[in-house]
């Protein structure tokens, strides 16, 4: 509810996101000590902004908002805009522990919810990576398969970061 209220009058796209079953099982296989109940990115939402400046401005004001949900990590831990992944992924992930006082919501207390922040350019790039996974035998998102896709997408991320956002991507 707090996100709906804060984004209502702003040019921000808000979308629910649920991790696909296959992706959950894959993550549990890759990280055998992980428990499904403690997986922090199964449910959440994605906020898509027109610019990096708007993204950081909104996130900064949201961090100062008064609510009971608790961010589970340091502010910059999952800031992949400042520190892009080698794959070229850029965006920010904040994980909150859901805290609700109402009787109706009590069953959800303690649930981890992820908020992803991306620009439209970053979202388009991430969507292209997903599409490659759907139409080829490769999974560049997980660094599996033909590494030419990974290399091409990392370069594409760098080009987009520099040309569209005035930032660096995964390359120095």
Predicted region positions:
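Residue(s) in the substrate-gating loop at a strand-loop-helix junction
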Residues: 47
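A short, structural micro-pattern
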Residues: 39-41, 86-90, 107-111
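Surface-exposed, low-hydrophobicity interaction/linker segments
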Residues: 1-30
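Hydrophobic side chains in well-ordered alpha-helices
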Residues: 55-61
């Amino acid at each position: 509810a707090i996100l709906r209220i804060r984004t209502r009058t702003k040019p921000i796209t808000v979308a629910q996101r649920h991790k696909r079953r296959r992706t959950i099982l894959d993550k549990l296989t890759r990280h055998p000590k992980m428990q499904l109940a403690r997986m922090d990115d199964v449910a959440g939402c994605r906020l898509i902004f027109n610019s990096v400046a708007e993204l950081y401005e909104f996130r900064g004001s949201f961090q100062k908002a008064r609510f009971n949900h608790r961010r589970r990590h340091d502010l910059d831990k999952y800031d992949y805009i400042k520190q892009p992944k080698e794959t070229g992924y850029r965006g920010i992930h904040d994980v909150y522990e859901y805290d609700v006082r109402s009787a109706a919501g009590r069953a959800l207390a303690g649930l981890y919810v992820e908020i992803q922040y991306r620009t439209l350019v970053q979202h388009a790039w991430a969507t292209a990576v997903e599409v490659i996974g759907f139409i080829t035998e490769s999974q560049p998102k997980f660094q599996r398969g033909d590494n030419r896709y990974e290399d091409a997408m990392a370069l594409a991320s760098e080009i987009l970061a520099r040309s569209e956002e005035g930032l660096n991507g995964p390359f120095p």
